[in-house]
Amino acid sequence: MENNKVDVEQSLQLINNMIQKAKANFTDNGHGWLIWGTMIFMASLSTYFFIEYNFPNIFLAWNIFGGIAILLLLYNFFKPSHSKARSYVSDILKYVDIGFAVCLFVIIFSINVSVGPNNGFGYLLMIYAFLMLIQSGALQFKPLLYGAIINWIGSMAIFLNTELKYDMLITAVAVFLGYIIPGLILRSQYNKEMATSKQNVEL
């Protein structure tokens, strides 16, 4: 009977250790959210002003964003990992990122051939929100959950709206609140954790 009690305690301790290890593996310095958020924010605002002032190529900023995005995604997928530790959850999240990238390009393709930009950007915000929801669960980080909700609301607002220039403003606001602000919070938390770890090592 006593051995069974010890086994149960050891099992619970093992599970707890695995959970803590998993949490440690999913730290995020916020740089990715800031980079992507800033690019989308700038592309959206640029497009708004291009439309407002009758610029001949209103999607110039998005074309530039698309080229940079392809390079960043390729780098992210093929860069060597500095950590040898792998987990079931990290493998799943890698496939989620791949699926997100594929959906992103399918939506962009549809904007160019059939759906049109007025609805297409609504679908983009919808897929952004889906990624935020998953990452908020992996990181146990509420601001990304709030960002997901904001982006879903933004996508519905775009579907209700009929003018592309206002779609761009909605996208800019949704991305600022959903990407950039959580990214700044994550970076601040990460810097504090690194400073604390450095102090502990020095002690």
Ranges and model annotations:
Residues 53-61, 112-120, 163-170:
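Membrane-helix interface and helix-disruption motif detector
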Residues 134-203:
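Terminal transmembrane helical module of multi-pass membrane proteins
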Residues 87-148:
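Membrane-proximal helix-loop-helix units in multi-pass membrane proteins
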Residues 54-55, 81-84, 114, 189-197:
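Membrane-interfacial segments
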Residues 35-42, 64-71, 102, 127-130, ...:
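Lipid-exposed faces of alpha-helical membrane segments in multi-pass integral membrane proteins
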Residues 23-109:
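Selected alpha-helical membrane-embedding segments in polytopic membrane proteins
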Residues 44-47, 73-77, 111, 155-162, ...:
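Structural signal for membrane-spanning alpha-helices in multi-pass inner-membrane proteins
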Residues 1-29:
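N-terminal juxtamembrane cytosolic/stromal segments of multi-pass membrane proteins
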